[in-house]
Amino acid sequence: MLDTIRWDADLIRRYDLSGPRYTSYPTAVQFHEGIGPFDQLHALRDSRKAGHPLSLYVHIPFCANICYYCACNKVITKDRGRSAPYLARLVREIEIVSRHLSREQVVEQLHFGGGTPTFLSPGQLRELMSQLRTHLNLLDDDSGDYGIEIDPREADWSTMGLLRELGFNRVSLGVQDFDMEVQKAVNRMQTPEETRTIVEAARTLQYRSINLDLIYGLPKQTPDSFARTVDEVIALQPDRLSVFNYAHLPERFMPQRRINADDLPSPGQKLEMLQRTTEQLAAAGYRYIGMDHFALPDDELASAQEDGTLQRNFQGYTTHGHCDLVGLGVSAISQIGDLYSQNSSDINDYQTSLDNGQLAIRRGLHCNSDDRVRRAVIQQLICHFELAFEDIETEFGIDFRSYFAELWPDLERFAADGLIRLDAKGIDITSSGRLLVRSICMLFDRYLPSLNRQRFSRVI
């Protein structure tokens, strides 16, 4: 399952479509306002009855500085006092949620994201973790996967020591690019030394895993400059790497309007960056997990992919997909059984709801039977690059070929083009098709607009 990916420029040009990242199916685009707090409470009670383990996501939206490329839900402020009122509401949300869960439900996974979680003071971080431990069953023996996103400019050795003391054992560091011209163009000045210091601290303090985030396609980047950044990152030997494609959508994300579109690399240059990056990482011993993610062979993600247990949810690739995911904080998304739900993305609305003693769920959806079938298919393909029809047929009581009869001509074209191997038993994505797994999964997405589906069929 972990063969080296093969670069096929012709296939990539033909199948390089815009499409979902499939951290869920159906995707968040399908969320509607018919889902509210009552649905969330009902799902939490069902989770309690089933005794499901938990994965928690905690959103801290504050950033001291704006990065022009960013599309996250965030509050830009240098006023550290703004976090206190937010934390009071976050604790209130934790209290409400915990009433509908059981102390028997172990929190196997915890992730603090943002924003910049280390925007919080040491005292606030201690208090937040104390409240989580008071109301929910966090593990005390370091066996859980407890991670936090870190801006190396907002952390030092003492920060890393505190976080380790509080129970965090995984860190994800934002790097994006080490080139100074690129950093100036996106308003994120960060020296390699700042990143190296945090990596060294994480190793010394025995964090289990270090992830670094890179972005290709940023203004002022060139294939050569990005290759130098990748070399510098490889020298740091992170356990995992995320290499994201920058999507320039200034009409949707206001900070991106500060980026000069003339400074963006061409599509051809972006493809060259991706090709060289995959080659550099492969030469350095990294495995391609899928969807922009790479890991060392002894990392848990690589091991899970090899033994067939890797999963994917709103936290990305995970070994805890069996957990019910509970999102806490403004804009946070939960996945509890067949319910997807999302908190208000407006911080004032979020806080007002909790002041009134109510959860701030504003949108979401319930998966139907067809969603569950397609979710299982997409999950298997995106995590393992192969699908046994018998597994889906046994789980859902269907005949795979009959159920997806209208897709068969497209699957046969994929096979003829070399993206997949298709036979009576299943689908195997080839080494040439793995970089295009998103395009393959799009075929099974019944919610894609018909225009996109037609475009998807015509590119062959």
UniProtKB/Swiss-Prot annotation:
Alphabetical keyword list: 4Fe-4S, Cytoplasm, Iron, Iron-sulfur, Metal-binding, Oxidoreductase, Porphyrin biosynthesis, S-adenosyl-L-methionine
EC numbers for this chain: 1.3.98.3
Record domain Radical SAM core: where: 48-287
Binding site residues for S-adenosyl-L-methionine 1: Y57, G114, E149, I333
GO molecular function: 4 iron, 4 sulfur cluster binding; coproporphyrinogen dehydrogenase activity; coproporphyrinogen oxidase activity; metal ion binding
GO biological process: porphyrin-containing compound biosynthetic process; protoporphyrinogen IX biosynthetic process
SUPFAM superfamilies per the UniProt record, alphabetical: Radical SAM enzymes
Binding positions for S-adenosyl-L-methionine 2 per the UniProt entry: Y69, G115, T116, Q176, R188, D213, A247
A Pfam cross-reference name: Radical_SAM
Binding residue positions for [4Fe-4S] cluster: C63, C67, C70
Biological pathway: Porphyrin-containing compound metabolism; protoporphyrin-IX biosynthesis; protoporphyrinogen-IX from coproporphyrinogen-III (AdoMet route): step 1/1
Keyword Oxidoreductase among record annotations: yes
Induction remark: By the redox response regulator Anr under aerobic and anaerobic conditions and by Dnr only under anaerobic conditions.
Enzyme class label: oxidoreductase
Cofactor, free-text remark: Binds 1 [4Fe-4S] cluster. The cluster is coordinated with 3 cysteines and an exchangeable S-adenosyl-L-methionine.
Entry superkingdom: Bacteria
Family (UniProt): Belongs to the anaerobic coproporphyrinogen-III oxidase family.
NCBIfam families per the UniProt record, alphabetical: hemN
The name this protein goes by in its record: Oxygen-independent coproporphyrinogen III oxidase
Organism (species): Pseudomonas aeruginosa (strain ATCC 15692 / DSM 22644 / CIP 104116 / JCM 14847 / LMG 12228 / 1C / PRS 101 / PAO1)
GN (gene name): hemN
